[in-house]
């Protein structure tokens, strides 16, 4: 399963995979595997990505089109 939304969010933020990997404390290669879907994304990483982008895990994995978290 390709995670298009995490790629779109990264590109919209003008970040390279390497830069986001550094922010998340993982390698560029690991992050690339998450984006392409060649490796599943651990729940801990989904939480970190949702926090970083101020969105929800549901949005990241395509369960909703509502990007904003419920306040």
Task: Name each model-derived stretch.
Residues 1, 12, 38-41, 52:
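Helix-turn-helix/winged-helix DNA-binding modules
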Residues 4-23:
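Short basic helix-loop element that most often maps to the first helix and adjoining turn
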Residues 5, 16, 42-45, 56:
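Residues that mark the N-terminal boundary/hinge immediately upstream of a DNA-recognition element
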Residues 6, 20-21, 31-34, 60:
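Conserved hydrophobic/aromatic packing and binding residues within compact polymer-binding modules
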Residues 12, 61-71:
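Short, charged recognition helix plus adjacent turn
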Residues 25, 44-59:
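DNA major-groove recognition helix of helix-turn-helix/homeodomain DNA-binding modules
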Residues 25-40:
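Recognition helix of helix-turn-helix/homeodomain-like DNA-binding domains
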Residues 35, 53, 61-64:
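DNA major-groove recognition helix of helix-turn-helix
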């Amino acid at each position: 399963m390709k995670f298009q939304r995490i790629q779109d969010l990264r590109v919209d933020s003008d970040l390279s995979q390497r830069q986001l990997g550094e922010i998340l404390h993982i390698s560029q290669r690991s992050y690339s595997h998450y984006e392409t879907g060649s490796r599943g994304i651990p729940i801990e990483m989904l939480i970190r990505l949702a926090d970083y982008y101020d969105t929800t895990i549901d949005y990241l994995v395509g369960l909703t089109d509502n990007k904003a978290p419920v306040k």
